[in-house]
């Protein structure tokens, strides 16, 4: 109700949600309030439903992480640390902004639907 009132009066023009569950919850609230696609909406992480909402124009963009890269860099840093090498205090594992224009890009598709057999074997 508060969202609908603020959006109707021009008080809310854009939204950002910081994880998959809040992004999905906000999408449901916007759909229920008939505001989906009427406000700028950027979320974080992805699911099939959220990607469908990007494709449908109900979410403007999603920020995606690269779980494989996160794990790989973490293990590499730990191995380096155990071998006595210097390890940076922070490591940027990367993020990718996904919108309707680049959703079908092969690099984006690899993030949202990784070929697990490639890494885990048959």
Regions found by a protein language model. Name each.
Residues 1-122:
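A residue-level marker of the well-folded mature domains of exported/periplasmic proteins
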